């Protein structure tokens, strides 16, 4: 009796329906989804504010990166370096400081949470006392260093408002807190858009102590105009 021909197409079809095949396919799909989420959460570089997702704000995902420029007493530009040292940043991979286009188009503007520094001279408006001191202090403290930013919100100028921390010889420092300690910033006065994380009480306590010690802006005494008052006078005509 001649052998009965085997229909390979039928065998392939029934093989696909095997539970093991389904389990393997489901496992591969789950692994791919999980890997993509890990990549987006920890390893994807955020090049600009356009790459920043609402999820990152909702969950306060920490960002690690390099301070490329300090342009004012309470904000700076930040080049995101996900994975930090473990992914080679600083020893295998370099921040492209010599590329002006990248420094402009692929950095995030960070606004320090909870504080307001004295206003510098803009558009013919006079500078506040200690405005240059605040700028110089922040440059010396952050420029050219790797920092961690915890984002809280995005303001009207498309800046990420968040807590910035930097490692110093005596531990990790909250930059907003250090500015308050040294009297080069005050606690943010605005009612709208104020962000403190869970540090508002601490910030107010540090400001109170700096005021008592007459540090920085508090050395001016009763003549001291806060940044909020300055903006009302010179920008809103009050």
UniProtKB/Swiss-Prot annotation:
Q: Mind telling me which residue stretches traverse the membrane in this protein?
A: 20-39
Location of the active site: 111, 119, 159
State the source organism's domain of life: Eukaryota
InterPro entries on file:
SNase_OB-fold_sf (IPR035437), Staphylococal_nuclease_OB-fold (IPR016071)
Under the heading SMART domains, the entry gives: SNc
Q: One GO cellular component from the entry? A: membrane
EC nos: 3.1.-.-
Its annotated compartments are: Mitochondrion; Membrane
Q: Does the keyword Phosphoprotein apply?
A: no
Q: Enzyme group, top EC level?
A: hydrolase
Which residues does Ca(2+) bind?
A: 116
**Keyword terms:** Calcium, Endonuclease, Hydrolase, Membrane, Metal-binding, Mitochondrion, Nuclease, Transmembrane, Transmembrane helix
Q: Where is the TNase-like domain?
A: 61-220
Query: What kind of membrane protein is this, topologically?
Result: Single-pass membrane protein
GO MF term (any one)? metal ion binding
Pfam families listed in its UniProt record: SNase
Q: Per the similarity annotation, which family is this?
A: Belongs to the LCL3 family.
Tell me the protein's name: Probable endonuclease LCL3
């Amino acid at each position: 009796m001649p052998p009965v021909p085997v229909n390979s197409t039928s065998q392939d079809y029934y093989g696909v329906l095997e539970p093991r095949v389904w389990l393997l396919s489901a496992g591969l799909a789950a692994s791919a989804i999980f890997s993509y989420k890990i990549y987006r959460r920890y390893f994807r570089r955020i090049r600009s504010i356009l790459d920043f997702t609402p999820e990152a704000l909702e969950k306060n995902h920490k960002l690690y990166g390099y301070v490329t420029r300090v342009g004012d007493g309470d904000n700076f530009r930040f080049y995101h370096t996900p994975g930090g040292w473990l992914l080679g940043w600083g020893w295998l991979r370099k921040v492209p400081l010599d590329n002006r286009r990248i420094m402009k188009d692929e950095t995030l503007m960070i606004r320090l949470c909870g504080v307001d520094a004295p206003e510098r001279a803009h558009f013919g408006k006079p500078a506040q006392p200690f405005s240059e001191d605040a700028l110089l202090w922040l440059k010396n403290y952050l420029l050219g260093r790797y920092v961690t930013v915890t984002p809280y919100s995005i303001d009207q100028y498309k800046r990420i408002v968040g807590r910035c921390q930097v490692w110093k010889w005596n531990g990790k420092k909250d930059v907003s807190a250090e500015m308050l300690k040294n009297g080069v910033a005050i606690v943010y006065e605005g009612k709208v858009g104020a962000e403190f994380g869970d540090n508002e009480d601490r910030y107010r306590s540090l400001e109170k102590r700096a005021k008592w010690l007459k540090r920085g802006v508090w050395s001016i005494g009763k003549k001291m105009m806060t940044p909020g008052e300055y903006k009302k006078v010179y920008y809103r005509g009050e």
